[in-house]
């Protein structure tokens, strides 16, 4: 079973969200990285870009496929993990720590509340 930290929120598109004050840190779940296989490239937005909930904000490329990343919340990108440019394997090795992808200042904080808990996400992936 995938590693699912309880303090995080989860989206149907397999992104995780960590609330940090008035900002949220976003990455992909352990389940997602294991489904994708070895990650070889990560494409992310620029600081200052706006992201829309349920719309693509970047992509991850694995040896098997290219998969779009979907924003779990709308808002402005205030930080991007540039470490992933040179170390895309962090997504496989440490999806919740080293491989966070972007930090967003949400335009609507209630979107975070609509995301799934770890238990709800676990139930969803067990049905896939």
From Swiss-Prot:
The keyword Lipoprotein does not apply. The keyword Metal-binding does not apply. Pfam families: GCV_H. The modification N6-lipoyllysine is found at residue 64. Its cofactor is (R)-lipoate. Binds 1 lipoyl cofactor covalently. GO terms for cellular component: cytosol; glycine cleavage complex. Keywords: Lipoyl. SUPFAM superfamilies: Single hybrid motif (SSF51230). GO terms for biological process: glycine decarboxylation via glycine cleavage system. Residues 23-105 form the Lipoyl-binding domain. The glycine cleavage system catalyzes the degradation of glycine. The H protein shuttles the methylamine group of glycine from the P protein to the T protein. Is also involved in protein lipoylation via its role as an octanoyl/lipoyl carrier protein intermediate. Belongs to the GcvH family. HAMAP family: GcvH. The glycine cleavage system is composed of four proteins: P, T, L and H. This is Glycine cleavage system H protein.
């Amino acid at each position: 079973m995938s590693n699912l930290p309880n303090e995080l929120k989860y989206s149907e598109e397999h992104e995780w969200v960590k609330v940090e004050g008035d900002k949220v840190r976003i990455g992909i779940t352990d389940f997602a990285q294991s489904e994708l296989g070895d990650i070889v490239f990560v494409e992310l937005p620029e600081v200052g870009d706006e992201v829309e909930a349920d719309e693509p904000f970047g992509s991850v490329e694995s040896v098997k496929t290219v998969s779009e990343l979907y924003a779990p919340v709308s808002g402005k990108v205030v930080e991007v993990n540039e470490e992933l440019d040179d170390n895309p394997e962090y997504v496989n090795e440490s999806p919740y720590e080293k491989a966070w992808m972007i930090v967003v200042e949400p335009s609507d904080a209630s979107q975070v509340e609509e995301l799934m808990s770890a238990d709800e996400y676990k139930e969803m992936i067990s049905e896939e």
